[in-house]
Amino acid sequence: MIEKIWFENHPVKYLLWPLLWPLSLLFGAISRRQKAAYQRGAKASFQASIPVIVVGNITAGGNGKTPVVIWLVEKLQQLGFKPGVVSRGYGAKAPVYPMVVDSESLTSHCGDEPKLIFERTGALVAVDPIRPNAVKRLIELGANIIVTDDGLQHYALQRDIEVVVVDGQRRFGNQQLIPLGPLREPTSRLQNVDFIITNGGDAHQGEIAMSLMPDMAVNLMTGEKVTVNELASLVAFAGIGHPPRFFKTLEQLGADVVVSQGFADHQDFDPEAIAKLAHQGKNVIMTEKDAVKCRRFAQNNWWYLPVSAQFSSHDQQRILQRITEVVKEYGSSTA
């Protein structure tokens, strides 16, 4: 219901407005005070010895940050860098922090996005709610540039480049601060970032258009790849920030979806519940992010659909050129 108020102008907003409006004012006041404390030095912020790129957003929920992080990491690797990725591991609880993700890491310990980023890129990934501690660990392990998955509002970590990802369809909803609206910070915050990347929809002036291009479906058990429309009677589910985006992609690919089910972002799936859902069709299709949580109890008819961020060559060059400029300021070189 809350997202209907934020993004769909649901009539119930008139009932909840008197309750939520004061809370939004309080949220905004606290956020401004905390940010100002870091800016004037009343609160300490960590300056890393290597460049830091923050990929975040100003709204709650999933906007497509992780594909951007993966794209950045892969490009940096191609350029000879050794990137390290920082995440707070939302929804997870590690036995010790900072936690360095590896092939044996459980998503319940590190989080689904960190595990996905590690599996896709093989990069160094460290999880810690206190992000500067994760950065320090990655530097110890040899990283020479940092990419943070989320953390735009984590001002305890200084950054050199800020990238904001915007949902091109939903944009900023009713443009109110949490909890009345989806905003973590006012839209005026966008005036001070390096790049605004628009995921789908129409990019506004000054924004970079991004599309998420689906690949072939991959079998969770065997790694076999097929086109989605080769799979009959699909049960589709997604536990991401905005599940309808995934279902829309399947529709555009001509997938034979008989059942679709959305779950909360970062939800820890119950194997029995997923198995029961799977019995409603002949095959199961899920997002790659969900696959990292389902692999341990997957069946041989379960598939996931990987997607990759795509930009125009001009926009790619703009982003990479800015990174190169920052690296030169540090006097750094590729590994």
UniProtKB/Swiss-Prot annotation:
A Pfam match: LpxK
Single annotated GO MF: tetraacyldisaccharide 4'-kinase activity
Any one of the GO CC terms: plasma membrane
EC numbers: 2.7.1.130
Catalytic activity: a lipid A disaccharide + ATP = a lipid IVA + ADP + H(+)
Pathway: Glycolipid biosynthesis; lipid IV(A) biosynthesis; lipid IV(A) from (3R)-3-hydroxytetradecanoyl-[acyl-carrier-protein] and UDP-N-acetyl-alpha-D-glucosamine: step 6/6
Sequence positions that bind ATP: 59-66
Record-level GO BP terms: lipid A biosynthetic process; lipopolysaccharide core region biosynthetic process
Keyword ATP-binding attributed: yes
Keywords (A to Z) from UniProt: ATP-binding, Kinase, Lipid A biosynthesis, Lipid biosynthesis, Lipid metabolism, Nucleotide-binding, Transferase
Enzyme kind, highest EC tier: transferase
Cysteines paired by S-S bonds: none
Family: Belongs to the LpxK family.
HAMAP family: LpxK (MF_00409)
Function as written in the Swiss-Prot or TrEMBL entry: Transfers the gamma-phosphate of ATP to the 4'-position of a tetraacyldisaccharide 1-phosphate intermediate (termed DS-1-P) to form tetraacyldisaccharide 1,4'-bis-phosphate (lipid IVA).
Listed name of the protein: Tetraacyldisaccharide 4'-kinase
Organism encoding this protein: Vibrio vulnificus (strain CMCP6)
